[in-house]
């Protein structure tokens, strides 16, 4: 998609359809991991280097429940090509295929907590090692431990799982700390190979730029070239794997469901107890219905003077009421 205009801000984004099949957070871990070096840019943290050295006005990567997006923006056209080069090499030729430690660092690994000696530190002796406690660690693992310590996040996951039990939305795309350690390195690589390819991507260009030059750059440098992911896929086909198992995860379609009641217990104080009501309002493609729902819920619950919220608070049924669509 090319959105040519006279805005001096020039932007590029590549997105991949990444509906999860479980709650291991594989796509969240991939989002972190591909930005830990690539074939053309074998540095430890290219993302950090770009923040320091480029003229970027926006630089990020985001994992959603059904897609992963890598957007960049800058006011300088040549800088845009530099940013595109780094990001495209990161997503198509990441260092994850040659450096398993990236998966362990960003996803999960075992770590031994040693007991403190008399001097206050584990002495590393055989006895100390035997008494040590093995625990999980990892960037995404710890990030999601923090995210899911919020009762609102736990409630949101429970509502989605109840409303969309047969689809990708039943899973925690960011990763559930209880499920993340079930993800293996081979599954991690296979998931990248199946999803991070041009046929499963969508590219957007925006701003005052030479569209023909940009398209030629994309095609010549990456879209028409073999990638680390495509080479792994070719090897799998050559080894006799069923091609149908190599396709990206489907989003899934389900029949209407009714879930009258579901309780989720969490180690928290009674003051943090929550109750939620979820409704499936139809397809997201029905834009008029979506906008109407936004307006309706804003009118009913959008402020302390909104009628439904005001009535609930006045009745003492809760300390706060929120809604979102």
Annotated model-derived regions:
Residues 8, 23, 286-287:
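Short glycine/serine/proline-enriched coil/turn segments at secondary-structure junctions
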Residues 1-8:
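N- or domain-start disorder-to-order transition segments that initiate the globular core
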Residues 17-19, 33-250, 254-258, 263-292, ...:
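Charge-rich, well-structured scaffold segments of protease-associated domains
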Residues 26, 30-34:
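Active-site His/Glu-centered metal-binding helix of metallohydrolases
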Residues 15-25:
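Short pre-active-site segment immediately N-terminal to the catalytic Zn-binding motif
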Residues 8-14:
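Short, conserved catalytic-motif segment at the N-terminal edge
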């Amino acid at each position: 998609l090319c959105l040519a205009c006279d805005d001096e801000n020039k932007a590029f984004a590549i997105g991949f359809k990444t509906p999860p099949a479980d709650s291991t957070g594989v796509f969240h871990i991939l989002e972190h991991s591909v930005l830990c070096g690539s074939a053309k840019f074998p540095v430890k943290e290219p993302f950090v280097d770009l923040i320091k050295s480029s003229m970027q006005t926006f630089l990020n990567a985001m994992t959603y429940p059904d897609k992963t997006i890598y957007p960049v923006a800058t006011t300088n056209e040549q800088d845009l090509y530099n940013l595109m080069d780094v990001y495209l090499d990161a997503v198509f030729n990441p260092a994850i295929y040659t450096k398993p430690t990236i998966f362990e660092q960003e996803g999960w690994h075992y770590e031994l907590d040693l007991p403190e000696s008399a001097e206050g530190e584990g002495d590393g002796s055989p006895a100390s090692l035997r008494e040590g406690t093995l625990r999980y660690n990892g960037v995404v693992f710890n990030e999601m431990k923090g995210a899911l310590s919020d009762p609102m996040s736990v409630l949101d996951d429970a509502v989605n799982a109840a409303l969309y039990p047969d689809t990708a939305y039943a899973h925690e795309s960011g990763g559930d700390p209880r499920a993340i350690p079930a993800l293996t390195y081979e599954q991690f690589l296979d998931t990248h190979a199946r999803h991070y390819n041009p046929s499963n991507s969508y590219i957007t260009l925006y701003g005052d730029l030479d569209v023909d030059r940009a398209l030629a750059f994309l095609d010549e440098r990456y879209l028409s070239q073999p990638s680390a992911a495509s080479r792994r896929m070719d090897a799998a086909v050559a080894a006799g794997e069923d091609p149908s198992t190599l396709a990206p995860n489907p989003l899934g379609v389900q029949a209407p469901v009714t879930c009258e009641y579901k309780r989720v217990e969490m180690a928290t104080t009674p003051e943090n107890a929550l109750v939620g009501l979820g409704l499936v309002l139809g397809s997201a493609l029905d834009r008029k219905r979506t906008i109407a729902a936004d307006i309706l819920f804003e009118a009913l619950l959008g402020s302390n003077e909104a009628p439904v919220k005001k009535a609930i608070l006045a009745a003492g049924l809760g300390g706060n009421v929120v809604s979102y669509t």
